[in-house]
């Protein structure tokens, strides 16, 4: 893999820490600002909504810009939003800053994925994507627990300052190491061509799969810190360590998934999400048992991150070379799930199911995900059969013409 792909992964680690650390920081924010936990949970949804809007919007508005210029610009806006959030401890302003940082993060994500797949051959795109996404698993291993500890011992604002500092360092690295050209592209993408690429029905099924992937995860992960403290009964100091284990599982899943995604994407998606559904059901029933919960958290990270390279590989396989806007819509699709899931699973917290009930919601999303994958596989086989038939029909015509 080219070095630049690993640099992009490092950038995602810095920014992804902000996305994922809220699971552990939410209790501190809620306590500091006098909010209910479910109300503080809307910060997760706000960030996801910013990503949904920002991914296609930033992709279109920066279509003509050099990638290096756009990437650094997104990082600078992201830094400014985190500094603002740390300086003004108001829930309304914090919500606004989460939206702004998410828009910038979405733009960076979209360009990072497109840059990664453009630097490798088609049969290595899934692995390239897995390297970039591995930045998130590193964020869960190092950044998220670190953010949680900072929030617990120095205030949640300190965690935001730390994210801003890490992003600033990676922005300097991008400025130094990333070439100033567009990469392998010989001309800037055309918006009309990019829009036409979105007209494929099976592409939207793949987007649905992406949405359900993140919905399954964030239905549980958004409240995982609270589950570990209030249901499992772990001490506040142990919660960051369990989140580290989630990240370890995620890294293992990405390593395996990245190597399988290009060869057998459908099998990986079905087996991986089937495994996640089983893990979610087990968590719903055993969240009060500490050792079982810890094991299940590791498996949860491994299964959900294990399928993510295949989800992206499916989208980029359908899009082909016209992938700038389509890749951005993938980011938006993922974050529709992130936005909706905490709101849906939050509804069960006040029922007799309690916090552990969020795992049942995650399992339901996982089952729906498998249905979407089966539909995608059916449409793909029909598409391939149609393409083969057209090729076979054109060969006799070509022979007769000669």
Task: Give residue spans per PLM region.
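Helix-breaking motifs and short loop linkers at transmembrane-helix boundaries and internal kinks
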Residues: 34, 66, 87-93, 233, ...
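Helix-to-loop junctions at the C-terminal end of transmembrane segments
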Residues: 54-67, 253-265, 349-350
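Cytoplasmic helix-loop-helix junction between adjacent transmembrane helices
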Residues: 97-136
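Paired small-residue
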Residues: 77-84, 92-101, 291-299
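Helix-loop-helix hairpin linking two adjacent transmembrane segments in secondary transporters
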Residues: 91-93, 122-179, 227
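Structural signature of the two symmetry-related core transmembrane helices
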Residues: 69-83, 164, 267-282, 363
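Conserved MFS/SLC helix-loop-helix module at the cytosolic interface between two early adjacent transmembrane helices
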Residues: 53-92
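C-terminal transmembrane helical hairpin of 12-TM major facilitator-type secondary transporters
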Residues: 267-311
């Amino acid at each position: 893999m080219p070095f630049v792909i690993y640099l992009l992964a490092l950038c995602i680690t810095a920014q992804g820490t902000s996305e994922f650390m809220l699971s552990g920081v939410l209790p501190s924010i809620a306590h500091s600002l006098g909010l209910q936990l479910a109300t503080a949970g809307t910060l997760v949804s706000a960030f996801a909504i910013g990503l949904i809007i920002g991914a296609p919007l930033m992709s279109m508005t920066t279509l003509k810009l050099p990638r290096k210029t756009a990437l650094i610009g997104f990082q600078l806006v992201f830094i400014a939003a985190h500094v603002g959030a740390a300086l003004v401890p108001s829930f309304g302003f914090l919500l606004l800053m989460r939206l702004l940082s998410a828009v910038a993060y979405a733009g960076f994500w979209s360009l990072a994925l497109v840059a990664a797949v453009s630097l490798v051959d088609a049969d290595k795109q899934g692995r390239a994507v897995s390297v970039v996404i591995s930045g998130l698993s590193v964020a869960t291993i190092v950044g998220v627990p670190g953010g949680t500890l900072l929030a617990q011992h120095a205030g949640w604002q300190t965690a935001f300052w730390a994210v801003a500092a890490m992003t600033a360092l990676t922005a300097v690295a991008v400025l130094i190491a990333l070439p100033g050209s567009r990469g392998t592209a010989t001309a800037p993408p055309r918006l009309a061509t990019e829009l036409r690429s979105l007209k494929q029905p099976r592409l939207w099924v793949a987007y649905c799969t992406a949405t359900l992937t993140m919905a399954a995860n964030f239905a549980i992960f958004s409240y995982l810190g609270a589950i570990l403290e209030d249901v499992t009964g772990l001490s506040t100091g142990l919660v960051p360590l369990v989140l580290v284990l989630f990240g370890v599982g995620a890294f293992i899943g990405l390593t395996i998934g990245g190597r399988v995604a290009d060869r057998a994407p459908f099998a990986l998606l079905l087996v991986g999400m089937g495994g996640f559904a089983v893990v979610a059901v087990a968590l719903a029933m055993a969240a009060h048992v500490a050792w079982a919960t810890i094991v299940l958290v590791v498996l949860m990270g491994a299964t959900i991150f294990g399928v993510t390279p295949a989800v992206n590989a499916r989208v980029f396989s359908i899009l082909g070379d016209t992938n700038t806007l389509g890749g951005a819509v993938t980011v938006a699709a993922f974050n529709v799930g992130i936005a909706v899931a905490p709101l849906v699973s939050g509804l069960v917290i006040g029922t007799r199911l309690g916090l552990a009930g969020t795992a049942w919601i995650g399992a339901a999303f996982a089952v729906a995900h498998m249905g979407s994958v089966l539909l995608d596989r059916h449409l793909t086989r029909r598409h391939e059969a149609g393409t083969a038939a057209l090729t076979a029909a054109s060969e006799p015509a070509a022979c007769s013409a000669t």
